UniProtKB/Swiss-Prot annotation:
GO terms for biological process: cell division; cell wall organization; peptidoglycan biosynthetic process; regulation of cell shape; UDP-N-acetylgalactosamine biosynthetic process. Pfam families: EPSP_synthase. The modification 2-(S-cysteinyl)pyruvic acid O-phosphothioketal is found at C117. This is UDP-N-acetylglucosamine 1-carboxyvinyltransferase. Its main location: cytoplasm. Cell wall formation. Adds enolpyruvyl to UDP-N-acetylglucosamine.
Amino acid sequence: MDKLTIQASPPLAGDVIISGAKNAALPILMAGVLAETDFVVSNVPNLRDVTTSCKLLRCLGAEVTELGDGQIRISTTNLNEFCAPYDLVKTMRASILILGPLLARYGTADVSLPGGCAIGARPVNLHLHGLEMMGAKIEVKEGYIKARVDGRLKGAHIFMDMVSVGATENLLMAAALADGETVIENAAREPEVIDLANCLIAMGAKITGVGSATLRIQGVERLQGCNYRVMPDRIETGSFLVAAAVTRGRIRCLKADPASLESVIAKLEDAGAKITTGEDWIELDMQGKRPKAVNIKTAPYPGFPTDMQAQFCVLNALAQGTATITETIFENRFMHVPELIRMGATMELEGNTCIIQGIESLSGAQVMATDLRASASLVIAGLVADGKTIVDRIYHLDRGYEHIENKFQGLGAQVVRTQ
């Protein structure tokens, strides 16, 4: 099993090119099922979850062609299977996003209950309740969601009990081909949801309210393929910015989207970073200074993203002062904390809050990645820890970061992948 070996590194310096967003690419790939003609997606990152998504589409009978340079073409002409099996779904929660498209276009879908990162109960009931309101008959048995609808799904007025990115995306895709108008209230407003909506509009969907908490979708009878470019990955961008801040360096993230990262940029500025942005780049310069502690409370967009919480735990571990980080989105999302404590961090958990006393330095250790973003935080910690850090189980990292060791090496870090 691969691992990363990290030596204490100098301040990061240079340019890093940001990949396409995993959390936008996965639903957009699933949306290919809705299109009657060829659909080409570009700026798709080369990640394990993307590979799994392509396998899932092929398993359904779709023709998936990797055109190189981050481009994937999807043709559904021969799609004739409607079951997403356990062996694929268990490795990737986003597989649930095939449910809405299959049901909307073909009237039938069997999807295994999902797996993915083990960071608490992320229930699928919001997805199922919304589809039932649109006329689907759903039963869960033998570990599968079995959904059917006679004819087309029907437009409905859906109020989401809680903000859910995945459920918003699933219902948005289903509603695009439904009969009549669907209104989704308390919809997720994340940039990745906006990206999916813009993609569906390019395919011929009629959607208004994009970027707001109320989405209105006037269903159409058919959608066509299009060429669509996936947005930049804001979490990858944020991870590199935090790494630069922790190492007191100066880097520039290219092919980025500053507008999608306002809450993270604000916190980095609070920590003492000098940040400059252009239309598609962000520069962070710590001017050699140690970061200052910053309090964080995760929240749905436009609040502070839960996917950046672990990285800021590391920043605060090495910052001047004491900070609290409160996690409001997922329970059980502080699994990186015991590993950081093993590296010498002064942290204490109280319920869903982590209290962190900043110290001057960490010590290298053998640590274990438990989920995608936790693994990124351990790599960042290794960059500033005295001695050698080995991060095991980095298959988590490969689910969300493209060529992470190469990108860090390009910024001057000593990071090597080994068997």
